Amino acid sequence: MVAISEVKENPGVNSSNSGAVTRTAAHTHIKGLGLDESGVAKRVEGGFVGQIEAREACGVIVDLIKAKKMSGRAILLAGGPSTGKTALALAISQELGPKVPFCPLVGSELYSVEVKKTETLMENFRRAIGLRIKETKEVYEGEVTELTPEDAENPLGGYGKTISHVIVGLKSAKGTKTLRLDPTIYESIQREKVSIGDVIYIEANTGAVKRVGRSDAYATEFDLETEEYVPLPKGEVHKKKEIVQDVTLHDLDVANARPQGGQDVISMMGQLLKPKKTEITEKLRQEVNKVVAKYIDQGVAELIPGVLFIDEVNMLDIEIFTYLNKALESNIAPVVVLASNRGMTTVRGTEDVISPHGVPPDLIDRLLIVRTLPYDKDEIRTIIERRATVERLQVESSALDLLATMGTETSLRYALQLLAPCGILAQTSNRKEIVVNDVNEAKLLFLDAKRSTKILETSANYL
């Protein structure tokens, strides 16, 4: 499986530093769907070549997701191998941006010994649903100018002293303020290792202390220092601050499913043991949903339906498909994008149910199907040329034509995978450009699937 979120950009393509080493993944060249303002796909744009209808259909889906009119629906990307199904799913995630949850997985990931497959599916469903919580907090923010703990006699007697309160002076761009804080807040200040000259903020309601960094007025104090310097906070010391936090429903489920234990010895020993992966009950999820609904009604939170991408959907069995039907009808559901490279095939878990793409007929009826078409020779040549640019390889025109022909006769993946070996062979011959001889030599060294099959057929008695 290609990790969809692994490489978002390749700064080495246009970088002047030729010595920089950048990792190139299978879909590094994909930057988006490549649509104009009216939603029409350009032939070569955003890392895509061709697939005009499929890209325009995905563009409509992206608009529906942004308008929040697509939740609880499902799309099927259907097409042969090497036709860009995973690339389309990656492009959808990039068009939606980082704030919209995107959860990719392969059909075989749902099978586990410890947890039911339907439970794993529901976990990924909840991972693909985001919750944006907006909270207005009263905070005191500024540079620490005074930090004085006040001692008092120990009420229990003896010679020891206790902290009765703490005097903290804070300075901002518009004034200063002196605060008298509780001793428990002083413990938080000590944990954050706050000293005079640090910029901190203190939440008025909870008393939580956060050290932001060192004031930039002290930047010239040392020649070398590991501190992060921040400017003096603007405005008054006492202010109202809006804090936005993005979480998923699965995060809330896990937080409530694993409460902290008590202080007794048995509870502490239990926390030391490695927790086994367990199922989250439906009752707990319903309670979380009630709290989420309450926050939404109060205007504190906003629900963000994301995208759940399931590749190789033909690997799912009839039980998961039945559960998927039910999950799609839920009032809290993400957009589900499925991908399959199979035609008419038997549904897994059945003996005689043959259905398109390995998906049962009742689920097929719910899907919007987007078809991806095989690439022609010119499109394969353009893809190989762009891929060579991403991998910083120079290929002469005749070698590109030969690779395009091989991609047409065998597969696009085989032609793309030959690029790196061809580059090594060209370097071995002290050439900066890949030529036809390099391609032919790499072809002899590495077999494609068709030639490998022929060899096995002729040597069946030997192997």
Curated annotation (Swiss-Prot):
Residues annotated as transmembrane: none
Superkingdom, taxonomy of origin: Eukaryota
GO MF assignments: 5'-3' DNA helicase activity; ATP binding; ATP hydrolysis activity; DNA helicase activity
Ligand binding (ATP): G79, G80, P81, S82, T83, G84, K85, T86
InterPro entries reported for this sequence: AAA+_ATPase (IPR003593), P-loop_NTPase (IPR027417), RuvB-like (IPR027238), RuvB-like_C (IPR041048), RuvBL1/2_DNA/RNA_bd_dom (IPR042487), TIP49_P-loop (IPR010339)
Entry's Gene Ontology cellular component terms: chromatin; Ino80 complex; NuA4 histone acetyltransferase complex; nucleus; R2TP complex; Swr1 complex; TTT Hsp90 cochaperone complex
Subunit structure of this chain's protein: Probably forms a homohexamer. Interacts with RVB2 and may form heterododecamers with RVB2. Component of the SWR1 chromatin remodeling complex composed of at least ACT1, ARP4, RVB1, RVB2, ARP6, YAF9, VPS71, VPS72, SWC3, SWC4, SWC5, SWC7 and SWR1, and perhaps BDF1. Component of the chromatin-remodeling INO80 complex, at least composed of ARP4, ARP5, ARP8, RVB1, RVB2, TAF14, NHP10, IES1, IES3, IES4, IES6, ACT1, IES2, IES5 and INO80. Component of the R2TP complex composed of at least RVB1, RVB2, TAH1 and PIH1. Interacts with SPT15/TBP and HSP90.
Record GO biological process: box C/D snoRNP assembly; chromatin remodeling; DNA repair; protein stabilization; regulation of DNA-templated transcription; regulation of transcription by RNA polymerase II
Keywords, sorted A to Z: Acetylation, Activator, ATP-binding, Chromatin regulator, DNA damage, DNA repair, Helicase, Hydrolase, Nucleotide-binding, Nucleus, Transcription, Transcription regulation
Principal location: nucleus
Biological role: DNA helicase which participates in several chromatin remodeling complexes, including the SWR1 and the INO80 complexes. The SWR1 complex mediates the ATP-dependent exchange of histone H2A for the H2A variant HZT1 leading to transcriptional regulation of selected genes by chromatin remodeling. The INO80 complex remodels chromatin by shifting nucleosomes. Its ability to induce transcription of some phosphate-responsive genes is modulated by inositol polyphosphates. The INO80 complex is involved in DNA repair by associating to 'Ser-129' phosphorylated H2A histones as a response to DNA damage.
Subcellular location(s) of the protein: Nucleus
Catalytic activity line of the entry: ATP + H2O = ADP + phosphate + H(+)
Region of interest (Disordered), ranges: 1-20
Keyword Cell cycle applies: no
Protein name: RuvB-like protein 1
Family: Belongs to the RuvB family.
N-acetylvaline sites (modified residues): V2
Record carries keyword Mitochondrion: no
One matching Pfam family: TIP49
